[in-house]
């Protein structure tokens, strides 16, 4: 099972389970070496710690992918991705002097390293918030492909920056590598099984699927293939469940038949294994049926035998 934290209520909740699948994602929010991140707020490496404490092996823990075109300005957008498609459509990467220093569609790690080097060697542009980056020349897209191309093909990017009075069709975007993907993680087999009994893992929390580098979109394998395999493996490994039968319901109905003046049960009848608690039956005292249907003169004081008592 697991102990969960209800963020809305601030309470800890204990959940019993015979199988647990860890899918906690990466650890970008640790902001390793001060890098911004594209990861969600929950990407704090908790899954790695949980698995390690259960005796699971971790691999490639030193390997992370830095997306080369993370936003560096404005501050509210720092770390958010600017898709590679922007570069493949014509936007070039240039330093503060306007010099193009690398091919835009080279491997992510090579491009990210080149941008970091330009900034480290003082050829990057500085922001009012003391960050630095290089320019992604987005106005080139409309110059090369015709006016309106950027807004038509990348409306989300345009709207995102326009909220901060930046028009990417007229102004370049400042970018810097952002901590994007945790290549390493929990060691699992082809079905997502870890070395801890009853524990599976899937997604970015696992390691080995991408080696120590990865290509864009490869995380789809985690979702469509290995996530499904882990779920099926966990399901197949569970012991047979006790079948739900009508035995309890039949016994309770037999007892109610012995109550001479009860015409009908008005309360729902629940299986004790589903209710999880003692079910109190509230009956209404029945009068003789009239022409207008069933009437009641008030609640009954009769206490029927409890079919669920020991």
Each language-model region and where it sits:
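Glycine-rich loop(s) and the adjacent beta-strand/alpha-helix scaffold that form part
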Residues: 19-76, 80, 128, 217-233
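Short beta-strand segments that buttress and anchor functional surface loops
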Residues: 1-6
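An anion/pyrophosphate-binding glycine-rich loop and adjacent beta-alpha core
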Residues: 56-167, 171, 219, 233-239
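Glycine- and aromatic-enriched mobile tails/lids
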Residues: 94-105, 109-110, 120, 181, ...
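FAD/FMN-dependent oxidoreductases across multiple families
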Residues: 160-197
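Core beta-strand elements of the Rossmann-like FAD/NAD(P) dinucleotide-binding domain
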Residues: 8-19, 194-198
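Glycine-/small-residue-rich beta->alpha transition segments that form the dinucleotide
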Residues: 8, 17-19, 23-28, 166, ...
